[in-house]
């Protein structure tokens, strides 16, 4: 049951007919994991905190550098040298002190227990981390909302293969290969800051729809491609790989 402070804080959300107080209660009862506290992780964590996701855990072992500041909007000049996850938690609490939110400074790997989370935000720029998140989310039947951004382009997808066997997983579409992977990180390829802000905001928007809305048809099973030069947003229907080593069995 929402208290008076909740009703005031989330007033502009709960008046939406398909959202209402029940939707807000579902958000407040949601445990979410954010992997990455950089260009995507910052807007994801800030908007998830503002929306009232009740418990948030953020993983990132990296420290803040001056070259991060064009896009990692929670981090400021006087935060340089601080751990990204720790700093992001403090900035989120300034927006919403009523949620529970903690940071983890260790590297995210396959030993991390994700069983208590309801959904996972993939905000990493490391290919191996994305495969690990995909495997864990499938195994433990979690919603995985994955974003990526480089230069002036972004991608977004919702993966629910563990919840519905008809959906593809990340590895169905991006299979592991022995070939050298293309450069997908901002450090080497470059990034325009607002692109990460847009994709991160879309990740939270999808999470809110998955958790809070009553009558909602999931966008899982699609890949969304954003082009910052043309403002095009393309939607590609994805097919399950029935030979996929992660989700085919």
Model features per residue range: what roles?
Residues 1-249:
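Adenine nucleotide-associated cytosolic modules
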């Amino acid at each position: 049951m929402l208290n008076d402070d909740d009703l005031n804080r989330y007033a502009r959300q709960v008046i939406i007919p398909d959202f209402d107080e029940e939707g807000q209660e579902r958000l407040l009862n949601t445990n979410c994991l954010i992997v990455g506290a950089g260009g995507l992780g910052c807007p994801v964590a800030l908007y998830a905190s503002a929306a009232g996701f009740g418990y948030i855990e953020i993983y990132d072992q990296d420290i803040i550098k001056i070259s991060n500041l064009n896009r990692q909007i929670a981090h400021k000049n006087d935060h340089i040298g601080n751990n990204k996850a720790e700093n992001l938690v403090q900035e989120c609490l300034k927006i919403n002190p009523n949620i529970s939110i903690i940071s983890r400074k260790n590297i995210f790997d396959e030993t991390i227990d994700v069983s208590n989370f309801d959904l996972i935000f993939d905000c990493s720029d490391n290919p191996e981390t994305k495969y690990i998140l995909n495997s864990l989310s499938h195994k433990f039947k979690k919603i995985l909302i994955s974003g990526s951004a480089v230069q002036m382009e972004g991608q977004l997808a919702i993966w629910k293969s563990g919840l519905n066997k008809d959906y593809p997983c990340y590895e169905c579409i991006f299979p592991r290969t022995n070939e050298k992977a293309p450069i997908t990180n901002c450090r080497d390829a470059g990034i325009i800051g607002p692109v990460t802000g847009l994709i991160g905001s879309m990740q939270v928007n999808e999470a809110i729809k998955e958790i809070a809305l009553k009558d909602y048809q999931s966008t899982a099973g699609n890949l969304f491609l954003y082009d910052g030069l043309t403002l095009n947003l393309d939607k590609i229907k994805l097919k399950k790989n029935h030979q996929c080593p992660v989700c085919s069995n």
